[in-house]
């Protein structure tokens, strides 16, 4: 009897493994009744209904991104495929990212249905398997790799380290970016340690316990503060890990807050990967007051992570970029005591005769209402005669009147 039970358990284990490795065969995940589109070799900017990349490639035409198709050369690792991580993976897949590497060891539950990604028929599946099936159906051009294990254990941490170090689009190259979408302190510290050791840039993200605020933080080892540079509750209040994890998990969760946080995360990831716009070092969100704080956190010289100290020294040893300052050209006044440039003219200075205006060239059907009279030579002579007469003395005028 016990032998038969062991055989049945072995069969069940094999079926579970097959279910995770072949997610498309799962009921409701990506059923055969839904026909997936064919793979597309190159992104096209052609505006047709059948082109899923036309609106993305329009970013080039609008001079936002220089070469959007470079996104196919990028590999991104997402740790945590929950409320924020699943939506992040969905957005990057729709943007046409080259490769996604998903890490999570949890299963889909009905309690997750208030999120934006998973569906009730996926309950019981591992999150990475369910996500991979759905994402592959959305965009078959994206290479998706899944890892169903806890990265915080010693053995799995080494596997995680090797994956992000050699899992890039080019074999043996590191990933281009790591996105942390986990909900506990221990996992964040594991990601922080791995990225500090391998000198990889990464984004940390999170949503508050009351579900009305969130944040993202861009961490560049040595340049900005790592997650261990400002240790939170564990060091400050000596709280054990179980208590911290219970407090850190969102007791409440809103799909709106998670969607906004995921949107901030992907938006800044795209800006970093495609080199456009300004990447925020820290961006927060408070839903109650619609407040979006931004700041930059400098690394702690006494950080407990020794690799962080090494990266800080390496960053300080780098040559600083030379900033060429343009010298301001001082405009000296025309006159030292006359800043308005007013010029004085003597009363006996010769007056320049104004040049008569030229008759403008009129279009067909147009004529001038009147023409200015031209000064003739006769008019000038009369003027001279009148001026001469005006110079006659009073006695001469009296004599002329008496003789009349």
Swiss-Prot record:
**Is Zinc found in the keyword set?**
yes
What Gene3D superfamilies does the database record attribute to this sequence? NAD(P)-binding Rossmann-like Domain (3.40.50.720)
- Active-site residues are 250 (glycyl thioester intermediate)
The Low complexity compositionally biased stretches are: 382-391
Question: Could you tell me the Gene Ontology terms of the biological process aspect for this record?
Answer: neuromuscular process; protein ufmylation
Residues where Zn(2+) binds: 226, 229, 303, 308
Query: Positions of the region Disordered?
Result: 372-393
A GO MF label: metal ion binding
Signal peptide coordinates: none
Listed A to Z, the keywords are: ATP-binding, Metal-binding, Nucleotide-binding, Ubl conjugation pathway, Zinc
List cellular component terms (GO): cytosol
Q: Key word Amino-acid biosynthesis present in the record?
A: no
Please tell me where ATP binds in this chain: 83, 104, 127, 150, 184
Top-level taxonomic group: Eukaryota
Which PANTHER family does the record match to this protein? UBIQUITIN-ACTIVATING ENZYME E1 (PTHR10953), UBIQUITIN-LIKE MODIFIER-ACTIVATING ENZYME 5 (PTHR10953:SF9)
Q: Which family does it belong to?
A: Belongs to the ubiquitin-activating E1 family. UBA5 subfamily.
Q: What job does the chain carry out?
A: E1-like enzyme which activates UFM1.
Can you say what this protein is called? Ubiquitin-like modifier-activating enzyme 5
